[in-house]
């Protein structure tokens, strides 16, 4: 997995497989509150970040796309990384991580908080 840095100095998850229009998702689940966030990128490989969807699961009882950024609180999360490897398969790996200010999973140096673009 690669972490890219945008022009606004925010770091975001990024990985693309070889298929022309892959589906990529990062899911974070807080181990204590069970609050869940997902970040989806359905852009073509050649044009990343042109088709993004941000969802805070359960925000209004259903999955709701967000136009603003999502702040992810410092805490203990299960981080699921999904990558579409073929037209029919969506693989995932699970990593367990404590998220602290300053780590480079998703980081905004403006407010020292977890932020999805």
What are these regions (language model features)?
Residues 24-28, 72-87:
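Short, aromatic- and glycine-rich surface loops/edge beta-strands on solvent-exposed regions
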Residues 85-117:
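Short beta-strand elements
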Residues 35-53:
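Solvent-exposed serine/threonine-rich low-complexity stretches and specific carbohydrate-binding patches
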Residues 1, 40, 67-68:
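Beta-strand-rich interaction surfaces with strong enrichment in secreted/lumenal proteins
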Residues 14-16, 29, 55, 82:
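A structural detector for beta-sheet-dominated domains
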């Amino acid at each position: 997995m690669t972490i890219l840095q945008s022009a606004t100095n925010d770091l975001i998850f990024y990985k693309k497989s070889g298929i022309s229009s892959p589906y990529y998702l990062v899911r974070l689940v807080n181990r204590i509150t069970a609050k869940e966030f997902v970040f989806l990128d359905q852009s073509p490989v050649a044009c990343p970040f042109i088709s993004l969807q941000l969802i805070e699961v359960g925000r209004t009882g259903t999955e709701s796309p967000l136009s603003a950024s999502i702040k992810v609180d410092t805490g203990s999360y299960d981080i699921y990384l999904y990558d579409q490897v073929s037209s029919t398969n969506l693989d995932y790996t699970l990593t367990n991580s404590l998220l602290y200010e300053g780590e480079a999973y998703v980081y905004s140096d403006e407010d020292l908080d977890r932020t999805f673009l």
